[in-house]
């Protein structure tokens, strides 16, 4: 009787783990759609400073036909596929191609971008907003060529630095737990 209970608990844990792993990954239709962006690899891996024309045209068609796939790619962790993908450069790809995209804040992992609120009518009074650049303490101001953000390799911890647990490792761990009850 105890063995049945442990198998049932293990089975429920396995189903829950598999469900959470598959829920976090893009759908297969989005994976095939995103693979059409292969001409963009040289840009998002840092091997090119500007995206190619085929990259920009394919990105434009993906954004027009399947914007939910772009949201899915942004919301999912970058899998370890042997490529050194620069997430910052990947997120700057639409700007580099001069392509308008919905703001990332409108991405919803389940449904893709949501509709934008209607623009205020010309008769409505909207407050004037002045945008001014801000600077960090100790930053120099004045004439210069701008600044570049360079990612640093620190010793601090961050949840973004942790790779997701691979499915095959999870399956191996479940197998070990299941077979350990026979020992």
From Swiss-Prot:
Extract one GO BP annotation from the record. seed germination
Q: Does the keyword Glycoprotein apply?
A: yes
Name the organs or tissues of expression: Expressed in seedlings, preferentially in the endodermis of hypocotyls and roots. Also observed in siliques.
As given in the record, the signal peptide range reads 1-24
For this UniProt record, the keywords arranged alphabetically read as follows:
Cell membrane, Disulfide bond, Glycoprotein, GPI-anchor, Lipoprotein, Membrane, Signal
Q: Which InterPro entries match?
A: Bifun_inhib/LTP/seed_sf, Bifunc_inhib/LTP/seed_store, LTSS, Plant_nsLTP
Q: Subcellular location, in the record's words?
A: Cell membrane
Q: How does it sit in the membrane?
A: Lipid-anchor; GPI-anchor
Query: Transmembrane residues, as ranges?
Result: none
The lipid of kind GPI-anchor amidated serine is covalently joined to 158
- Gene3D superfamilies in the cross-refs: Plant lipid-transfer and hydrophobic proteins
Regions of biased composition (Polar residues) lie at 149-158
A GO CC term? plasma membrane
Glycosylation site positions? 47, 86
**Pfam families registered for this protein in UniProt:** LTP_2
Annotated disulfide bonds: 30-71, 40-55, 56-97, 69-107
Q: Which GO terms describe its molecular function?
A: lipid binding; lipid transporter activity
UniProt propeptide residues: 159-183
- Claim: rRNA-binding is one of the keywords in the record: no
Instruction: Using the UniProt annotation, give all residue ranges assigned to the region (Disordered).
Output: 108-158
What function does the entry list?
Probable lipid transfer protein.
Question: What PANTHER family does its record include?
Answer: BIFUNCTIONAL INHIBITOR/LIPID-TRANSFER PROTEIN/SEED STORAGE 2S ALBUMIN SUPERFAMILY PROTEIN-RELATED
Similarity remark: Belongs to the plant LTP family.
Q: What is this protein called?
A: Non-specific lipid transfer protein GPI-anchored 15
């Amino acid at each position: 009787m105890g063995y049945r209970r442990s198998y049932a608990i293990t089975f429920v844990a396995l189903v829950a783990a598999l469900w959470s792993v598959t829920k976090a990954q893009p759908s297969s239709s989005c994976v095939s759609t995103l693979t059409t962006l292969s001409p963009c690899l040289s840009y998002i891996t840092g091997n090119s400073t500007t995206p190619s024309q085929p990259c920009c045209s394919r990105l434009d068609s993906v954004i027009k036909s399947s914007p939910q796939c772009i949201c899915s790619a942004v919301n999912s962790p970058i899998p370890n596929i042997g490529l050194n993908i620069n997430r910052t450069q990947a997120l700057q790809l639409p700007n580099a191609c001069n392509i308008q995209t919905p703001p990332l804040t409108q991405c919803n992992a389940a449904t893709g971008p949501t509709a934008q609120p209607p623009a205020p009518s010309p008769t409505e009074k909207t407050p004037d907003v002045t945008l001014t650049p801000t600077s960090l303490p100790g930053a120099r101001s004045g004439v210069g060529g701008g600044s570049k953000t360079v990612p640093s390799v620190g010793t601090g911890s961050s949840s973004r630095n942790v790779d997701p647990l691979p499915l095959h490792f999870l399956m191996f761990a479940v197998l070990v737990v299941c077979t350990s009850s026979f020992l």
